[in-house]
């Protein structure tokens, strides 16, 4: 059986995935979107042994899928994904939420957050809204901040433009 559910707000994919996983039924999620949708579904299924996921790339960046090679078309064919291989994947725990491949804070995260705001303009498409966001953040918002980063028993403190933890 296949069920298509449209999300209605930010965080909705996480809520849906958790609710469905609670049934105990064996589930496979096909997150149709980009990195944000993939992250929401992953946060909804983490810790459930009865769920797996893949992504059909229709988002702005689709950076998560680029970790599996340059050919995004293989992920656009839902039939190809139907019985595709499954494998476990590590995740990064960031204050109770998970990140699949990278957790960033600083200039990179600001640029990514602003892309969505600028992409609402009828004059900018996905790529040009990214370039515009990059320019605005570097030219007008500054690039450095003071950070305290704790990782297990290690604490680091300093002024950096970007803090990233990668999986």
Named regions from a protein language model:
Residues 1, 163-167:
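Short, intrinsically disordered, charge-balanced linker/junction segments flanking boundaries
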Residues 17-21, 42, 136:
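Generic structural signal for well-ordered alpha-helical scaffold segments
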Residues 14-18, 40, 86-87, 149-151:
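A generic local structural motif
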Residues 31-36:
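N-terminal glycine-rich "phosphate-gripper" loop used for MgATP/nucleotide binding
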Residues 13, 37-38, 63:
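Short, active-site-adjacent cap segments at secondary-structure transitions
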Residues 37-50:
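Short Gly/Thr/Asp-enriched flexible loops that form oxyanion-binding sites at enzyme active sites
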Residues 1-29:
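ATP/NTP phosphate-donor binding region
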Residues 7, 47-164:
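Catalytic core of DAGKc-family lipid kinases
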